[in-house]
Swiss-Prot record:
Gene: rpsK
UniProt entry keywords in alphabetical sequence: Ribonucleoprotein, Ribosomal protein, RNA-binding, rRNA-binding
Protein name: Small ribosomal subunit protein uS11
Similarity comment text for this entry: Belongs to the universal ribosomal protein uS11 family.
Naturally occurring in which organism (per UniProt): Wolbachia sp. subsp. Brugia malayi (strain TRS)
Listed GO MF terms: rRNA binding; structural constituent of ribosome
Entry-linked Gene3D superfamilies: Ribosomal protein S11
Length: 128
């Protein structure tokens, strides 16, 4: 009896998914998940060659989300996504525009940035 060898594990296809964008002041993280919340692909701006102050730019966030969108389309067959944005960073709008320009249909954009109601004490003021 012959043994059949498989070349590799084929990725499951997900037509719909969720893309989480976490934009901090120093970096932007992009996480592609299925509807249940299981992570399929994750990336950040720093992983694509941007370093230092260039990581916090909208251009860098757009490039990283472009790579994440292409991976979601080619590897997982995603077509429809909903976007969840967290954080006060600058790259959120550029990241969403890059997702739409790559061919993903964005059904909803939710901003779930945590807003403190006079929570923790702020850092001391910077004296210049």
């Amino acid at each position: 009896m012959k043994k059949v060898r498989t070349v590799g594990k084929s990725a499951k296809k997900f037509v719909t998914g969720v893309i989480h964008i976490r934009a901090t002041f120093n970096n932007t993280f992009i996480n592609v998940t299925d509807v249940q919340g299981n992570t399929l692909y994750q990336t950040s701006v720093g992983a694509h060659g941007f370093s230092g102050s260039r990581k916090s730019t909208p251009y860098a966030a757009g490039k990283a989300s472009e790579v994440a969108a292409k991976t979601a389309i080619e590897k997982f067959g995603m077509k429809v996504v909903s976007v969840i944005i967290r954080g006060p960073g600058f790259g959120t709008e550029a990241a969403v525009k890059a997702l739409q320009s790559c061919g993903l249909t964005v059904t909803s954009i939710a901003d779930k940035t945590a807003i403190s109601h006079n929570g923790c004490r702020l850092r001391k003021k910077r004296r210049v």
